[in-house]
Amino acid sequence: MTTDVNICTRIFSHCHTQPERLALHIPQMQGLNYMGEESLTYGELGERCAQMQSALAKLSLQIGDRVLILARPKINTYILMLALFSLGLVPVLIDRGMSRDRIFASIKASKAKVAIGETSILRLWWLFPPLWTLKRYAFDGSSIGVKDFRKLYAAITPELRCELLAPTAHGLITFTSGSTGTPKGADRTHGSLIEQHLAIRAHGQDTPDDVDSPCFPVVVLHNLCCGISTVM
């Protein structure tokens, strides 16, 4: 793979060609209690990604900068990830099942410039010293020391953008509880994310009418590249 790429080119093409197709359907749970559900078509996905892109553009971030995502797998989480990918910014995910010390170390090692996520998580930022020096935004509200990311959205939905990058450009960094010693993030490039998608597609043989219910949240990225529906 030698030409410039972006994992989002495949996804955004579906936003234009099949805007009415269901992209994501995610139940909202509080413990074992069902609190409702979120659904999103590909057309809505493109519009909301464009809004998040407009907000990210106001944070003075440069291509290659890292953004720490502190949120559960929700529709806003996936929209944020796609907005970051498409602008050449790098989402950083941290396994919240790790010990407090390892979470501290992972945040430091991430070299993130900004933290964006849910109010329910970010409102506890003061308990995590590595977050003290980061800009903090929540995509679902605000709290003391946490700004409302939605206030940065453009008044009119802008055009959806997608920056083409070298295949070796950083795509996604994840810190998990499986590592030992000093936390080391698994670094997936845009090229490797695309190759992973193509490998899964060759093995799985998806069809246009598929509705998939993956157990592994990152597989949602593959499903979106295929243009199929995901129910979590």
Regions flagged by a language model, labelled:
Residues 52, 82-87, 109, 224-225, ...:
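Short hydrophobic alpha-helices that are characteristic scaffold elements of the AMP-binding
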Residues 71-72, 92-105, 119-121, 230-232:
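ATP-dependent adenylate-forming carboxylate-activation enzymes
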Residues 19-22, 154-175, 182, 187, ...:
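Conserved pre-ATP/AMP-binding loop-to-beta segment of ANL
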Residues 39-43, 171-198, 229:
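Conserved AMP-binding A3 loop
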Residues 30-34, 120-167:
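ANL superfamily adenylate-forming
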Residues 3, 20-62, 69-74, 78-82, ...:
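Conserved AMP-binding/adenylate-forming core of the ANL superfamily
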Residues 90, 194-211, 216-232:
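Conserved AMP-binding/adenylation subdomain of ANL enzymes
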